[in-house]
Amino acid sequence: MAVRIRLKRMGAKKKPFYRIVVADSRSPRDGRFIETIGTYNPITEPAEIKIDEELALKWLQNGAKPSDTVRNLLSKQGILEKFHNLKYGK
């Protein structure tokens, strides 16, 4: 089972709001997911990003691959750098 960390679209038409979820890569974008690890609201200025750092690091260590957008969000929050330091022992 290939696990991805990706965005699940919520909100109304023309007003997107996203949940950052861990899901099987074969499930639909807004379909079944394993766990919610955060939220992303691109409408606010500046964009509001809330991610549970412990859960994100746990899933990254277990081999979950982030989507391109989620990878950018994780790096903005400094989580990818912490994961890199944990993985390579710096």
Swiss-Prot record:
Lineage: superkingdom: Bacteria
SUPFAM superfamilies per record: Ribosomal protein S16
GO biological process assignments: translation
Entry coiled-coil feature ranges: none
Signal peptide residue numbers: none
Gene3D superfamilies in the cross-refs: 3.30.1320.10
Keyword terms: Ribonucleoprotein, Ribosomal protein
Cysteine pairs bridged by disulfides in the record: none
PROSITE patterns noted in UniProt: RIBOSOMAL_S16
Keyword field contains Transmembrane helix: no
GO cellular component terms listed in the entry, alphabetical order: cytoplasm; small ribosomal subunit
Molecular function as annotated in GO: structural constituent of ribosome
Family: Belongs to the bacterial ribosomal protein bS16 family.
Protein name as it appears in the record: Small ribosomal subunit protein bS16
Organism: Geobacillus sp. (strain WCH70)
